[in-house]
Amino acid sequence: MTMFNKIVKEFQWGQHTVRMETGEIARQASGAVIVDVEDTVVLATVVAAKSPKAGQDFFPLTVDYIEKTYAAGKIPGGFFKREGRPSENETLTSRLIDRPLRPLFPEGFYNDVQVVIHVLSINPEIPADIPALIASSAALAVSGIPFNGPVGAARVGYKDGQYLLNPTRAQIAASDLDLVVAGTERAVLMVESEAHQLSEDVMLGAVVYGHEQMQIAINAIHDLVREGGKPEWDWAPAPKNEALIAKVSEIGLPLLQQAYQLRQKSARSTKLKEIYATVQAQLAEAGVEADKVEVGNVLFDLEAKIVRGQILAGEPRIDGRDTRTVRPIEIRSSVLPRAHGSALFTRGETQALVVATLGTKSDEQIIDALAGEYRDRFMLHYNMPPFATGETGRVGSPKRREIGHGRLAKRALIPVLPKDDEFAYTIRLVSEITESNGSSSMASVCGGCLALMDAGVPVKAHVAGVAMGLILEGNKFAVLTDILGDEDHLGDMDFKVAGTDAGITALQMDIKVQGITKEIMQVALAQAREGRMHILGAMQGAMGHARTELSAHAPRMITMKIHPDKIREVIGKGGSTIQALTKETGTTIDIQEDGTITIASTSTDGMAEAKRRIEGITAEAEVGKIYAGTVLKLLDFGAIVNILPGKDGLLHISEIVNERVKDIKDWLKEGQQVRVKLIQADEKGRLRLSLKAALAEEGGSISPIAQGDAPAAAPAAPASPDQQQ
């Protein structure tokens, strides 16, 4: 007899075996499901408040995806040895899970819902995001909370003309596509992808393929609910106050229709605030008791009805455009005098100032991920301060939205970046959104590409991005190019497409309704290509190609190779040699384990000097070669002479001159410069030198110290450069 009512479902999903269970762990949560995909194990829990907070006018869903270091057999770093603030990957995965779940909660359901996902075990080859999304959907499904799911999800790769279902990390690295799609049995709700300039048909095919394959997971969730699901909540939306709706419509509809004739955002926003206040005041005068939140919801529905109706009727959009027109574009490059690269990209009332900075390998971001530590040479940071929308607000660390928008823009640009061996710089792009009225992430893509080109980064092609919208009513639909912020809020689909002339590099899609077909998506993608090509034309006209020279303020770099065994000599004891080198030459020096050395500096002379000194430190002494040496120490039987950095040899007393030498001090002194020939090197690295052999070969001479003030070898023909090492 067990105290648990444990339900387990197993199914084969592509190349992976999936195990899904509920009823044993986290039983006090509204719903809890563990999903195990070949040792990647996640626990998703859901808890919902029994009633909404007073005055609540939105659905308060929170999703927290948490990676535990013990999942990979690690102990956290730092002083406290605990997991700290969410990593960028945790934030992005939380958003990935939130986006397909949120539209499926019924309208009017305002109870707090919290979804928490813990990664308990990680197989480095199996990413945890798809298991986490499946587990979250299953936990909601078994909880009985009002939810129009379940949701399925799949990752799709593309290689050699074939789609790959839930590829491993190794397969993703070799794939031309990394696409995540989520949806219900009937409809796609969310797409997130990065691609290597693939066509619209290939991208749409991947979405359809992923939706077909996720049905296996959806069916397994249905089976789990049948055996282990909790009773469904007895919940119904609050009845609509038809009398209030009629009164608010009577007062507000004509005013709102007038407001939406204003084409400028700030004027329209000001007018809308006035209308909301006017409606509240007139209701109070009429003695109508009404909750402010309820009135606001009615007015919002009226706004949506006006905007959607105008567009579906073929009337101009909010700002006067038709459905296909892109807003006016203005581009300016080299905006900031000391930055390595910069561009100001303005499209209508959306504006991004994007700045590129070049650095060395030591500037790479080191990411301590669960699957293993790695380095990232390309960073893109997106910031949108409140003034961009004419508002006041908090300024500080980036919010989830900013991290997500930055990641989307980064995905769009990665496929056109040069490889490390072609352009060894670390690159950081910062997109400062200075104005926003829709599509700021796509403005970051356009401005980011131009800033890279302004910095002299040899990108493979121009990349442009455009945000698209869709309005669907029954069998009628309209696709909108380059949407405004209001069109985003009032529409049924928001999708962003970025790419080059050759194809798509990033696609993000969020769908709020379940009636969007493959044919509608096909029309939308074709119209998005039209908009993208228009923007690419404007960008190519403003900057046809990347600058051939870097900014005067950017570091220059040279690369050299040494034997890995010599690395320790370049670094020196406790780093003394490398520290002295960087300080004295004004350079930054990075040394890789394979012996690759990168020297960076704004000074060409400093780089050349650092390279010369490293070559000297790592040079191998060659038997038969003549070197310019320095006498370091006199011995009874000879002298120690330095011929290369870290390379000392013995000049025996018999190898100074042909005649017999009674006292070495008669011929040499410490600090004296002499030319010596390396005549022997044994297996232990001990070197034997000869001064007389060098004199004979070069035709020089040396005099005893007692007979002259300059006891050095007589001038001879200059040695070749390799002898001067």
From Swiss-Prot:
Region named Disordered: 702-725
Which enzyme class, named as a word?
Answer: transferase
Q: Which residues bind Mg(2+)?
A: 488, 494
* Superkingdom classification of source: Bacteria
Sequence ranges assigned to domain KH in this UniProt record: 555-614
Keywords of this entry: Cytoplasm, Magnesium, Metal-binding, Nucleotidyltransferase, RNA-binding, Transferase
Question: What are this entry's molecular-function GO terms?
Answer: 3'-5'-RNA exonuclease activity; magnesium ion binding; polyribonucleotide nucleotidyltransferase activity; RNA binding
Q: Which ranges does the record mark as transmembrane? A: none
Q: Where in the cell is it found?
A: Cytoplasm
Q: Pfam families, from UniProt?
A: KH_1 (PF00013), PNPase (PF03726), RNase_PH (PF01138), RNase_PH_C (PF03725), S1 (PF00575)
Family of this protein = Belongs to the polyribonucleotide nucleotidyltransferase family.
Query: What is this protein identified as?
Result: Polyribonucleotide nucleotidyltransferase
The organism's lineage is: Bacteria, Pseudomonadati, Pseudomonadota, Betaproteobacteria, Burkholderiales
Q: Which gene encodes it?
A: pnp
